[in-house]
Amino acid sequence: MKQSKMLIPTLREMPSDAQVISHALMVRAGYVRQVSAGIYAYLPLAHRTIEKFKTIMRQEFDKIGAVEMLAPALLTADLWRESGRYETYGEDLYKLKNRDKSDFILGPTHEETFTTLVRDAVKSYKQLPLNLYQIQSKYRDEKRPRNGLLRTREFIMKDGYSFHQSYDDLDVTYDAYRQAYEAIFTRAGLDFKGIIGDGGAMGGKDSQEFMAITPDRTNLDRWLVLDKSIPSLADIPEEVLEEIKAELASWLVSGEDTIAYSSESSYAANLEMATSEYKSSSKVTALDDLVEIETPNCKTIDEVAAFLDVAEHQVIKTLLFMVDHEPVLALLVGNDQINAVKLKNHLGADFLEPASEEEARAILGAGFGSLGPVHLTDGIRIVADRKVQDLANAVAGANKDGYHLTGVNPNRDFQAEYADIREVKEGETSPDRHGVLQFARGIEIGHIFKLGTRYSDSMAANILDENGRAVPIVMGCYGIGVSRILSAVIEQHARLFVSKTPKGDYRYAWGINFPKELAPFDVHLITVNVKDQEAQDLTERVEASLMAKGYDVLTDDRNERVGSKFSDSDLIGLPIRVTIGKKAAEGIVEIKIKATGDSIEVHADSLIETLDILTKDN
């Protein structure tokens, strides 16, 4: 493919509106362009990468018997009313009317559509299991699109749905998908973890997320590719290294999720779902009487603890939430933070949001900073974290502005239901007791769910079992964020290319090292002087030999300065660069392996053989 015939609009500078490196590079390298807020055009390079990823997916899904199809993106609202999600999905749902004023939506996901199709076609257990998937654009009305392809209003997704007679059968397919996802992301060259996840608006009982790990910005060895003029990192002057560190630190750490994982075992979970080992620390002690004490201007845990000269963990943190329009108190020890997802899941709620101060005054008679669980009116549900039950003679708000109670004791002074509703902390013991929890940022690239009968119950998707009884179909759901993969790959494979000029000056510039299976082309063939006929003839011969051996070749035939060509090549990020320069008359070409920065000159007749040797382990 001739580069002069492709739309690859590279930029000399990073785009000013980009905050994460993947967004900046995919724009600067000419992979995507924003059409409007949260809506992107995938230019030829991005399209080729996405198509290669689709091929990997199809190959792995063929192995587990998944069958591809295509459902409409424009959906009738009646389907979503039938499942109950039309009202509960929230403001992210694109709603529209046709000329007859009938309600439609643009599909953010397709559980209802697939459930209906199977419900209408499948009547007997003998027709199951079914394993269907599609790859298409989805739509969500994001309030604040950001970070390139990570948070958009239109995005490409692979969503699959499986249909079963039993949960045992679902378990088999669920595990097959888990293994397929691991194979797909491994082939795509991603560093990822499969973690315990939250089902969210999808419903269901079990789920696993697949997270691409955001690289550590402090590890220079994994970010820098050194030119052959620089033997090692130790040869770079300290002031240059400090500049490079500052450049790395100037980009936001990508990834909307924090992952908690064990330092010694396979345990890993989204922070929203993560737990740590819990050991009861309750002690037998004499219980003090309740005493109301004035605590002027003390509204935070640390202010109250300092005023009363107690440890922060002895102060009960009281938070008021409105849960499905009813008040719920959540209690924590003072130095812990609430995990709203855990609380919502414990309550089985559709909606959960912090109460306003006005609501707190109307319900409890006091403002924030003075709320507590003692002497409440009947009907207010209290959920306390497990650690609260270990407290004795604690401090809590008195539900009276500027006052707190001392001598507060769970079970004597208030009744609560206990659950794990706290956010874990780095360094705590893993729940499997192997290692301690460590944190990392990650980009969600896949999610699998055991939906169970969530949709078949609400949409009457039943089959007849062996005994002729009508039973609901058991479902699974399996998603991959296809367009997100491009961001995740670039985030992990962005590099700073460092070189040294003949005068001894150090230069560094951003580029991409695409993994072989996802690179839009295998080889970037660059002719330094396109006006040199011998160089042109050699270019055509090399191009033909590469293509004959199955290499996808992007030939830079533009009449541009060689510096611009090399700069664009680093940005675009193909695994191999072959340069035809001053030694074209001798038949000599230069091979450069982008991942390592290594280069070698060989005769054109030995090019294929040399490439086979250089790339056999890559």
From Swiss-Prot:
MF GO annotations: aminoacyl-tRNA deacylase activity; ATP binding; catalytic activity, acting on a protein; proline-tRNA ligase activity; transferase activity
Gene Ontology cellular component list: cytosol
Reaction equations catalysed: tRNA(Pro) + L-proline + ATP = L-prolyl-tRNA(Pro) + AMP + diphosphate
Keyword Ion transport part of the UniProt annotation: no
Keywords associated with the record: Aminoacyl-tRNA synthetase, ATP-binding, Cytoplasm, Ligase, Nucleotide-binding, Protein biosynthesis
Matching Pfam families: HGTP_anticodon, tRNA-synt_2b, tRNA_edit
Principal location: cytoplasm
Gene Ontology biological process terms in this record: prolyl-tRNA aminoacylation
NCBIfam families attached to this UniProt entry: PRK09194.1 (NF006625), proS_fam_II (TIGR00409)
Function comment: Catalyzes the attachment of proline to tRNA(Pro) in a two-step reaction: proline is first activated by ATP to form Pro-AMP and then transferred to the acceptor end of tRNA(Pro). As ProRS can inadvertently accommodate and process non-cognate amino acids such as alanine and cysteine, to avoid such errors it has two additional distinct editing activities against alanine. One activity is designated as 'pretransfer' editing and involves the tRNA(Pro)-independent hydrolysis of activated Ala-AMP.
Name of the featured protein: Proline--tRNA ligase
Organism: Streptococcus equi subsp. equi (strain 4047)
